[in-house]
């Protein structure tokens, strides 16, 4: 376990050096949101987190979770107080060693007032002791914590942290994590990243392997998946193979751990939790589905390595993860990307509400609408036809490297694609991502469609791809 030690004497000296001069404006409360117009209360202002250390104890029988979160951050403005996003009951908060007062507000705000104001640029250590029953908590009428027969799962987007640790919960504030979970013997806890140690008897069936580049792969399956067990394993066990294949398009796999897990939960979606995607057993109710594994692993580059600047930029995540499925279909001989584009385009007449959703800015109510995925992938294919394969695949691989471990917007992607291809792309992006109407088919697709008297034949891969359409619903 990695630990970071802050020497009290050094911290005290820093506090003196950074003391607010008498002539400065009085410190003010940090904003209760990071500034995302889709979700104004998500994330918080006034500080930037670098690391979370989470020490947790969980009782599966009662769903009782107790924890101590140590948060390392630095202020970005003079603060009289600041917020964390959190739902469980808080017993104590300390800021730089001193007890702080706290209260709650809104749906998920923990307001913390330190003993003394914090000057801009101050290193801050926040310790929060807490406990509660995550499954008993709701915000905005839903929960991101899902009970299973033997425990619980925290997996949701764009929010899930509130149910198990206090945080600045928005992709703009990236941080590293150490997670330690104590559970009763016969129970296991699974999280992201590299496993440091374990001492409990297994209730998950763990399988291990490595990718061709030597990345360790750990997959976990609940022992009570029933009829879905075989199909789940036949899909998720190909994780290493799929990651190696995606590396050919997106560049080297960006992390030092890899895997997937399938708990016995009644949710219907999968989620690209970093390094170890979550899959619902229902994803495999109709047999194996490697396509959903492709989708979630594509997000390790498009969504995790490079994250959205704001949630309106969701097309960069979902359009490219869907297009990765189209490329996999081609790889498996089950339909080319063009055939899938033709079928998708022809399947939705001009008056279909599908075309009213704008993937480049869909609004929070349509953030995970099927059009963000399928029309989003059509936009990716239109880009490919516009710039040609050489530049297209250079863009596909270069983008994750350019913005690695950062955030970017749809506008950033357009500028990058123009830089690589030398083509003006504003009109294409406007047509496929922002107009609430069915675009004219590109010349290549129009010619292809003209040869077919009726709707093009459904590619063999279509049903498996469509089975991922519930991926992120609450």
Give the location of each predicted region.
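Long, His/Glu/Asp-enriched segments that create or flank divalent metal/ion-associated functional microenvironments
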Residues: 439, 443-474
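Extended, low-hydrophobicity, Ser/Thr/Pro/Gly-biased non-transmembrane segments
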Residues: 43, 127-200
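A surface-exposed beta-strand-loop module
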Residues: 81, 87-146
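Surface-exposed beta-strand/loop patches in extracellular or lumenal glycoproteins
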Residues: 66-89, 165-169, 176-184, 411
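Hydrophobic helix-coil surface modules that form long, contiguous segments used
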Residues: 67, 170-294
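Zinc-dependent metallopeptidase catalytic helix centered on the HExxH motif
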Residues: 233, 275-341
């Amino acid at each position: 376990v990695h630990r970071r030690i802050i020497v009290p004497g050094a911290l005290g000296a820093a506090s003196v050096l950074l003391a607010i001069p008498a002539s400065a404006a009085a410190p003010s409360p940090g904003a209760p949101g990071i500034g995302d117009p889709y979700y104004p209360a998500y994330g918080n202002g006034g500080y930037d987190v670098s690391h979370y250390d989470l020490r947790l104890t969980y009782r599966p029988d009662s769903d009782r979770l107790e924890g101590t979160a140590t948060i390392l951050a630095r202020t970005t403005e003079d603060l009289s107080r600041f917020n964390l996003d959190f739902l469980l009951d808080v017993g104590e908060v300390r800021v730089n060693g001193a007890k702080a007062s706290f209260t709650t507000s809104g749906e998920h705000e923990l307001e913390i007032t330190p003993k003394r104001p914090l000057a801009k640029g101050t290193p801050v250590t926040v310790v929060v002791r807490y406990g509660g029953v995550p499954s008993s908590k709701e915000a905005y009428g839903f929960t991101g914590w899902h009970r299973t027969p033997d425990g619980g799962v925290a997996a949701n987007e764009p929010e899930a942290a509130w149910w198990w640790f206090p945080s600045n919960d928005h992709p703009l504030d990236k941080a590293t994590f150490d997670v330690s979970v104590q559970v009763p013997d016969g129970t296991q806890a699974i999280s992201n990243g590299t496993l440091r140690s374990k001492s409990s008897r297994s209730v998950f069936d763990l399988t291990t392997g490595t990718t061709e580049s030597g990345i360790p792969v750990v997959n976990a399956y609940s022992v009570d998946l029933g009829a879905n067990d075989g199909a789940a394993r036949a899909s998720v066990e190909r994780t290493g193979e799929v990651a190696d294949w995606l590396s050919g398009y997106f560049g080297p796999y960006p992390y030092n751990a890899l895997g997937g897990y399938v708990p016995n939960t009644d949710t219907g979606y999968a989620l690209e939790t970093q390094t170890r995607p979550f899959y619902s057993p229902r994803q495999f109710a109709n047999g194996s589905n490697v396509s959903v594994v492709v989708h979630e692993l594509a997000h390790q580059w498009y969504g995790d390595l490079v994250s959205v600047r704001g949630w309106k930029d969701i097309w960069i995540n979902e359009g490219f993860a869907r297009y990765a499925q189209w490329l996999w279909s081609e790889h498996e001989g089950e339909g080319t990307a063009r055939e899938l584009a033709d079928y998708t385009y022809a399947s939705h007449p001009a008056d279909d509400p599908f075309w009213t959703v704008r993937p480049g800015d869909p609004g929070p109510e349509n953030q995970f609408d099927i059009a963000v995925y399928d029309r989003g992938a059509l936009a990716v294919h239109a880009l490919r036809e516009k710039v040609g394969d050489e530049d297209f695949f250079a863009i596909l691989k270069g983008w994750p490297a350019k913005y690695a471990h950062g955030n970017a917007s749809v506008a950033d992607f357009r500028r990058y694609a123009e830089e690589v291809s030398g083509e003006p792309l504003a009109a294409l992006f406007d047509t496929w991502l922002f107009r609430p109407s069915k675009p004219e088919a590109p010349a290549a697709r129009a010619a292809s469609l003209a040869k077919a008297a009726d709707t093009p034949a459904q590619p063999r891969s279509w049903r498996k791809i469509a089975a991922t359409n519930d991926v992120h619903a609450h």
